[in-house]
Amino acid sequence: MSVYRVLPSGRQVRTVDTRKGWAAIHVMAGGQWEVTRRGKRLGAGSVWNSDTAEAKRRAESFLANIIETEG
């Protein structure tokens, strides 16, 4: 199970150690998600039904694909 910290703004953040440095998964209210590394956005999106659990799954899947392609 993934551990997300909840910031005072309500944003949920999880950090992941990758070969090219730390990446962060941000999940916001309304089902929006964003993946960043070193302050740069790698990708972002949202789910139609505002489901934060689904947003987490999509963000984690997105980051897993990036890690896999980096070799």
Predicted regions and their residues:
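A short, exposed loop/beta-hairpin motif centered on an aromatic-Gly-Thr core
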Residues: R38-E54
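Intrinsic-disorder/low-complexity regions
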Residues: V16, A29, W48-S50, A64
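Short N-terminal "domain-start" leader segments
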Residues: M1-E34
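Serine/threonine-rich, low-complexity intrinsically disordered segments
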Residues: D17-K20, R38, E54, E68-G71
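Short, compact, well-ordered microdomains
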Residues: E60-S61
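Short intrinsically disordered terminal tails
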Residues: M1-V3, A64-G71
